[in-house]
């Protein structure tokens, strides 16, 4: 979920990213390649619409996602960030979706939005495929005055860094930034972009961990170490080994 003044009335509104329709009283039974009980693939469950609660200024909220054009059909959302990505002074909404196209809702004024992720180059990876997007962070990592995006993904599919091209769109800068191979074997969830060492450049933190015990099938450990990256002005360098013992441990 994320807060932002989406209609420009001075009151914070709430956007809630929803995932799938799952009833624990009537669960879907899924298995891995060996027939053992396992986690279901997102395609096996129906999506739940996202919600946007507009602050009425009197302590109450009204759900207006459809009225504001802030709902992408068929999305299975796990992350959201509200920020001004096109530099017009109005907050936009980026939504990370699992195995479907990510969404970027551009604020067109008066509380109305236009979904523009495909047109602006941040709906899919640079290779053109939709990823298992989960965590999302925004920050100006290259200090050009425009907010960039970092999205975490499933194991065997690297996280993605989208560089903002001055408000006209985004480009996949993952490989150029040396972030492809370090993130490829891990499964990322939460992430933040912030200047953690006060050197003036944004850093990246990623919390990793598998969704299932795949060690018995693929050999992948479902406990995974977190990652910390620093930016040197050109590329990203993993620096967890020097940041303390926390980054040498594995978590779920």
State where each predicted segment sits.
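Acidic, glycine/proline-rich Ca2+-coordinating loop motifs
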Residues: 1-252
């Amino acid at each position: 979920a994320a807060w932002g003044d989406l209609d420009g009335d001075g009151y914070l509104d709430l956007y809630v990213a929803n995932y799938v329709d799952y009833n624990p009283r009537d669960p879907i039974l899924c298995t891995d390649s060996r027939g053992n009980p396992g986690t279901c693939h997102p395609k096996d469950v129906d999506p739940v619409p996202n919600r946007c609660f507009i602050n009425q200024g009197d302590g109450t909220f009204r759900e207006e996602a459809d009225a504001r054009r802030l709902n992408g059909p068929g999305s299975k959302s796990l992350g959201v960030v509200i920020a001004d990505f096109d530099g017009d002074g109005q907050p936009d909404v980026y939504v990370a979706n699992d195995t479907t196209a990510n969404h970027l809702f551009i604020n067109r004024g008066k509380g109305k939005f236009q979904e523009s992720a495909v047109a602006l180059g941040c709906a899919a990876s640079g290779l053109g495929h939709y990823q298992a997007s989960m965590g999302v962070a925004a920050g100006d990592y290259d200090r050009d005055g425009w907010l960039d995006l970092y999205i975490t993904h499933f194991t065997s599919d690297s996280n993605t860094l989208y560089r903002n091209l001055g408000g006209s769109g985004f480009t996949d800068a993952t490989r150029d930034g040396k972030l492809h191979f370090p993130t490829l074997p891990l499964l990322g969830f939460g992430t933040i972009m912030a200047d953690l060492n006060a050197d003036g450049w944004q850093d990246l933190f990623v919390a990793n961990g598998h969704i299932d015990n795949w060690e018995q099938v693929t050999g992948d450990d479902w406990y995974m170490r977190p990652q910390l990256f620093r930016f040197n002005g050109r590329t990203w360098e993993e620096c967890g080994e020097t940041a303390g013992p926390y980054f040498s441990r594995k978590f779920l």
